[in-house]
């Protein structure tokens, strides 16, 4: 069974996150599970401590920042915890609907800058990468794809790194709704691209934003909901192979179950959809995406 990696999910929303993670491992699923606030992260640290197939992200979701559930105290705790992990997510900006006000934009932007600064403490510059090389769909010039086969380190073998060394680059999952350009500006201003690896979850910015993000070396996690829109499908087609990842963003809300067969089916649907859009073999795509995911998660 091929290993599939869900690079943006929310196991903390499941009624029994530990059981969901264990069932996912048995189904050949590895995961980057994001959180929405530091308290959730700390709770899940204990619950998922024995889940070798899950990397847990420290998060401060922009919705929670905008409505005050993540305030100054929670942000201070985020900054403390950021020194102890290299997995960050979900963080970002959301300027849609009720959050599209001058006050909310200012609050979110200030918090995002604080979060990015905290991520940079003790970080060392990344080795240069070549995003342009990632555009190849053959085996050449894909600098960000590991050579390990998808079956070499299955999720259940304890291979995902959980904590950071003083200089470890972080893996950061970004939420940006009506705010892709602003998020890219903030990430550039914080030198995030020189220090860390950035994943845009369910990218929904403009075409210019996408091209800018690709050139900056961003990765993009793509799931069935992104592929449900014409723009999402076109973006998935355009994203270079070496910068593509899978996601489900599931469970969608607190209390929802995520059976392993549903979880794997969602990832398979995304994989098949992307393969069709790009006109490449599904198995080849699966190998490339699994290798990229493993390189990001395993240190």
Where do the PLM segments sit?
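Mid-domain alpha/beta scaffold segments of enzyme catalytic cores
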Residues: 1-299
């Amino acid at each position: 069974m091929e290993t599939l990696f869900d690079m943006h999910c929310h196991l903390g929303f499941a009624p029994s996150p530990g059981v969901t993670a264990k069932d996912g491992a048995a189904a050949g699923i590895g995961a980057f599970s994001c959180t929405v606030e530091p308290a959730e992260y700390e709770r899940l640290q204990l619950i998922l401590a024995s889940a070798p197939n899950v990397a847990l992200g420290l998060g401060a979701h922009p919705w929670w920042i905008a409505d005050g559930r993540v305030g100054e105290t929670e942000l201070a705790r985020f900054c403390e915890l950021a020194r102890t992990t290299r997995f960050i997510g979900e963080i970002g900006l959301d300027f849609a609907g009720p959050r599209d006000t001058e006050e909310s934009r200012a609050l979110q932007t200030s918090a995002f800058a604080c979060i990015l600064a905290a991520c940079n403490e003790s970080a060392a510059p990344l080795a240069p990468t070549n995003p342009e090389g990632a555009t190849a769909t053959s085996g050449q010039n894909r600098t960000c794809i590991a050579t390990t086969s998808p079956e070499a380190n299955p999720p259940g073998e304890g291979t995902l790194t959980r904590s950071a060394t003083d200089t470890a680059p972080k893996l950061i999952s970004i939420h940006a709704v009506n705010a892709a350009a602003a998020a890219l500006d903030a990430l550039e201003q914080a030198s995030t691209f020189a220090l860390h690896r950035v994943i845009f979850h369910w990218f929904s910015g403009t075409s210019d934003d996408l091209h800018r993000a690709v050139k900056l070396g961003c990765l993009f996690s793509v799931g069935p909901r992104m592929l449900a829109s014409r723009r999402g499908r076109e973006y998935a087609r355009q994203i270079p192979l070496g910068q593509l990842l899978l996601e489900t963003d599931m469970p969608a809300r607190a209390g929802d179950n995520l059976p392993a067969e549903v979880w794997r089916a969602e990832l398979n649907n995304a994989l098949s959809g992307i393969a069709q859009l790009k006109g490449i073999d599904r198995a080849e795509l699966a190998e490339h995406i699994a290798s990229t995911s493993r390189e990001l998660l395993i240190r």
